[in-house]
């Protein structure tokens, strides 16, 4: 996506790039869920693997035949803190395991949880030590303390990920265990979610470019209201007599809210940080967005 960024926006306007980026990513994610379910119904689940292999072969064939072979000057990867990178990865795996399986272990009534907490503290201490004493750490401490609003943005990301955990707890348990919907029926729900994703991207692009340029707070309020509407509908509409059609609107609201809030947080982070630290801040953002926030929300529920 970075290679074709200038095709999308020659001025590198992130309020244009981020909405278009989310359309491509979320379309692929929803299509994958839909395709894997139907391949499993029509034939064999291995067909999805063959499809992915075929797509990769087409991409490699295109790169071989249509792209000019050109390389920039070789730059050695000196000065990268590989040890801290491994420690951050280990910390994420430890936190994900703790938050996912602590309930199965009955939390602090089992010795495994206490051992895991001890290893998490050791890993975190090693990360903080290297962050303060290594010349070029993997995540610079200035990411958290050198820019205004970064900590507020990361805290809001974590909070909203907790709220989105309803999708994994209430929605999935209700649809699978109470309503006993099949895999195909659950896969069909990807369509209203995808529609909400695309609508959220187009609305965010229109809002930031035409209505109130750079007005992230108001756009964030719109996304928050859509998330609140999804949560209220999912809590109040839960009933064994619920029809499938009644689920389309809350699922649309979830897709719209997820996309809008993601664009707001990424664009806000880009504006408050300089180029040298933005990708480190983006790494922390994705750690919370993709791993810690959702796992913590599920654990709290």
What are these regions (language model features)?
Residues 1-60, 247-253:
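Transmembrane-helix bundle of Major Facilitator Superfamily
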Residues 17-29, 84, 88, 160, ...:
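Structural signature of transmembrane alpha-helices in multi-pass secondary transporters
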Residues 139-301:
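12-transmembrane solute porter fold
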Residues 17, 47-52, 112-116, 186, ...:
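Alpha-helical transmembrane segments of multi-pass secondary-active solute transporters
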Residues 39-41, 72-74, 99-109, 173-181, ...:
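Membrane-interface helix termini and inter-helical loops of multi-pass transporters
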Residues 13-24, 77-86, 143-145, 216-222:
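Cytoplasmic-side transmembrane-helix entry/capping segments in multi-pass membrane proteins
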Residues 43-154:
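Hydrophobic transmembrane-helix bundles of small-molecule transporters
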